[in-house]
């Protein structure tokens, strides 16, 4: 089987020739792996990295992670973005002028020129601070435009040709509904809204769902076969199962259903705590959940997760790339990868990977050993 066939077989719930070895590589690792490159690209350079090292590839394109309405102007929606570099940080201030008022968002992230496309911004000033902001947003936020839709189709065709049989592209959309809502409103306020201002919370989440579903409908009407959904903010360290099922699940489920109704797969990302939320992920109707992270990054146990939900959803991850992989001896890696693989491969529905993206500075011989052992031990 090719990497592409292998991954798609697992996502369908069938048994491949071996477990896919789908290591997650993005700008941080790629910039370290290719020190000669002035800038790295998480799709093109991930393809080259996968060819060199011999793993199965799931690229995580970020081209459509930022909504169209935050990138360009429309009628009654004038977007002005300012970028500032200061003391190793990159600040992005977006001011949106409408007939009824101005909305402003300020984000910041660590700046490194070679890996600039991989910056993960944190919001420091929020677009939706109060009910008036939401009224303005709901009234004037533009629908997705034909130019953005054309860009999606072109990018998907480009990715399909570039990746070939190495694997598949699983681009990030804007994120899960709660993730995106928490990007534009302080998460502490958002959590309290669910209890103290339910009408506001419902109106906001319904609008976010409508917009995200519309964008993902466009993403699925392309050559992309799997769509990534970031769900890391509503992790089990932040919310319990009861809160998640009542205030978050209905919206995320609508998004997942829209993607699947288009005949595409869903990849849900929570690289933190998720132990009490695993059954909720099944209720959501997801095809795949990553990263089954163990302590201290998460609170998950692969054997327990396989027994609880492994028949209903594809699991991916579990190898500690922070505290273990960067420091372990080759003999330790052989033992740990073998242990994880023998748990994950049982019954299928497993893609071997780390508990998040590979980190810069990870010894190359360690990564090669992971791939070697995972391929050998993953055969059915």
Language-model segments: what does each one mean?
Residues 75-140, 165:
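A contiguous, low-structure linker/loop signature
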Residues 3-8, 43, 76-81, 89-92, ...:
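Short alpha-helical segments and helix-capping/turn motifs at coil-helix boundaries
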Residues 2, 50, 87-88, 101, ...:
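Residue-level detector of functionally special positions within alpha-helical transmembrane segments
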Residues 5, 65-68, 77-81, 111, ...:
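Short secondary-structure boundary micro-motifs
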Residues 32-76:
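Segments that shape or occlude catalytic/ligand-binding pockets
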Residues 1-37, 97, 123-380:
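Active-site loop segments of alpha/beta catalytic cores
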Residues 1, 57-59, 63-80, 192, ...:
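Generic detector of solvent-exposed, compositionally biased contiguous segments
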